[in-house]
Amino acid sequence: MSVRNSRPQLSWPERVSPQRTIDTPTASGEMLTRRQSAPALVVPPEETTHVVVVKRQSPDAAAAGELVPSRRKDSVAVQSGIVATGPLDTTRSGARDDFLMALLECPVCFGYIMPPIMQCPRGHLICSTCRSKLTICPVCRVFMTNIRSLAMEKVASKLIFPCKHSHFGCRARLSYAEKTKHEEDCECRPYFCPYPDDKCSWQGPLRDVYQHLMSSHENVITMEGNDIIFLATNVNLEGALDWTMVQSCHGRHFLLSLEKINLGEDCQQYFTACRMIGSMKDAAEFVYNISLEAYNRTLRWQSKPRSIRENFSSFTNADFLVLNKHTVELFSEDGNLALNVVIRKVEERTN
């Protein structure tokens, strides 16, 4: 016969008896009623369970990414192969960091304020980007000054921030020194339409950019191969014009563009660009060559392709082939300009 262990009895504080009053005479003979204090109910502080993220092998773990119990009662282990991207919100330090990051929200753009952190004379914080556009504080309406909050800059240097593209799926958590660089080329950052006329407002993930070009910009054609001829027709027509096509090679898509810009009367320039439909990191793995040949003349250009992250309107400040009207006339035949484009992958150097 098995004997069932009785459950331990819970100890509750004794029931507080009804309050009794005690009459105390005063110096003048009046009777004052004094209320007897009831016994205080002491609630023990709730124990805080710390969560420690470790990386170890578990021979009997079910699958990758499964949480497996550690030997310590107050810790949780993560199976090897999963890297934690930031502190867990259930820890005390996570709650503290969330509170501090909430203090660093810009009241104008609602983004996190990164150093240099500006403040108004009354101490309200604002990011440097919004500060350059405002003359009065958006909170208290006093005139802004160029006062930096050095204390909050030190606080920001100790915090780990989420990527601003977290609502698109990015799970990276970074220091403020790494945050800006990561967000410029974040894989989850939406891409804008790379067509050079800047009239298309489409944006979406990288995997949909090429399909968008084919479906929404019918004049864009695709040529296969790493060595092609990009033919721009009627380059002598008046006005601002552009010619665009896609070159597919090395398992990638490259957007070739020739844009004619009027800078003034009788002053026209042609900007030739090769941009990769991909990230800036991927674009750095390739090199392209553009050559023009006509009437025993040869012009060659070599550079690295840019990513479509960069706006086409920034061509004048970028590293692209620029031709003036006279040069185009020298290399064009019957008003058509033929550009030989060769794209190759950069070979890794061996030590």
Curated annotation (Swiss-Prot):
Residues 18-27 have a biased composition (Polar residues). Zn(2+) 2 binds at residues 193, 200, 212, 217. It catalyses: S-ubiquitinyl-[E2 ubiquitin-conjugating enzyme]-L-cysteine + [acceptor protein]-L-lysine = [E2 ubiquitin-conjugating enzyme]-L-cysteine + N(6)-ubiquitinyl-[acceptor protein]-L-lysine. Residues 1-38 are annotated as: Disordered. GO terms for biological process: proteasomal protein catabolic process; proteasome-mediated ubiquitin-dependent protein catabolic process; protein ubiquitination; regulation of R7 cell differentiation; sensory organ development. InterPro entries: 7-in-absentia-prot_TRAF-dom (IPR018121), SINA-like_animal (IPR004162), Sina-like_RING (IPR049548), TRAF-like (IPR008974), Znf_RING (IPR001841), Znf_RING/FYVE/PHD (IPR013083), Znf_SIAH (IPR013010). Pathway: Protein modification; protein ubiquitination. A zinc finger (RING-type) spans 106-141. GO terms for molecular function: ubiquitin conjugating enzyme binding; ubiquitin protein ligase activity; ubiquitin-protein transferase activity; zinc ion binding. Residues 155-346 are annotated as: SBD. Zn(2+) 1 binds at residues 163, 170, 182, 186. Keywords: Metal-binding, Transferase, Ubl conjugation pathway, Zinc, Zinc-finger. Gene3D superfamilies: Apoptosis, Tumor Necrosis Factor Receptor Associated Protein 2, Chain A (2.60.210.10), Zinc/RING finger domain, C3HC4 (zinc finger) (3.30.40.10). Its EC number is 2.3.2.27. E3 ubiquitin-protein ligase that mediates ubiquitination and subsequent proteasomal degradation of target proteins. The adapter phyl is required to direct the degradation of the two isoforms of the transcriptional repressor Tramtrack (Ttk). E3 ubiquitin ligases accept ubiquitin from an E2 ubiquitin-conjugating enzyme in the form of a thioester and then directly transfers the ubiquitin to targeted substrates. It probably triggers the ubiquitin-mediated degradation of different substrates. Belongs to the SINA (Seven in absentia) family. The RING-type zinc finger domain is essential for ubiquitin ligase activity. Interacts with ebi and phyl. This is Probable E3 ubiquitin-protein ligase sinah.
